[in-house]
Amino acid sequence: MHPFAHLNIPQGALGIHWFEQNAYALKDSQGHLVLVDPYFPHDRPAERFVRPTPPVDEAALPITHVLLTHQHGDHTNPETLRRIHRAWPEAKVIGPIESIQQVLTETEIDAGHTTVIAAG
């Protein structure tokens, strides 16, 4: 497990960890772990990435929710989402309709594990 998975969060507090690019993990005192915009591709050309490997293995975090902010490739990444789903099949994916449509068509994640959100 990644060290963030073992971080003890006091009641009323929130743990935050940055995983590079725009990916963050949020953890509360009840153990909910939300991954925001996970982008961990395995094909990492040196001209585009600082590190040759992803900053975390998706199976190393007990992910309960994934929050996608919008449908750009580095915010809604089917490759990463497929690995999260294989490791944590009960994790819920939350995002705007465009992201959720992509999730439903390009991954094995079903509609019962997704929630559409909208501005307003």
Residue ranges and their predicted role:
Residues L68-Q71, P78, I94-P96:
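Glycine/small-residue-rich loop that forms an oxyanion/phosphate-binding "nest" at active or ligand-binding sites
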Residues Q21-A23:
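Short hydrophobic/aromatic beta-strand or adjacent loop that forms the aromatic wall/cage
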Residues H42-D43, H72-T76, I100-V103:
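Active-site environment of divalent metal-dependent phosphoester hydrolases
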Residues N77-A87, Q102-E106:
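Metal-dependent catalytic neighborhoods of phosphoester/phosphodiester hydrolases
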Residues F4, A25, S29-L68, E79-R83:
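Pre-active-site segment of Zn-dependent metallo-hydrolases
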Residues M1-Q11, V93-G120:
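Metallo-beta-lactamase
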Residues P38-P41, Q71, E98, G120:
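Active-site metal-binding loops of divalent metal-dependent hydrolases
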Residues H32, A87-K92:
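A short helix->loop->beta-strand "cap" motif at the edges of active sites that frequently abuts
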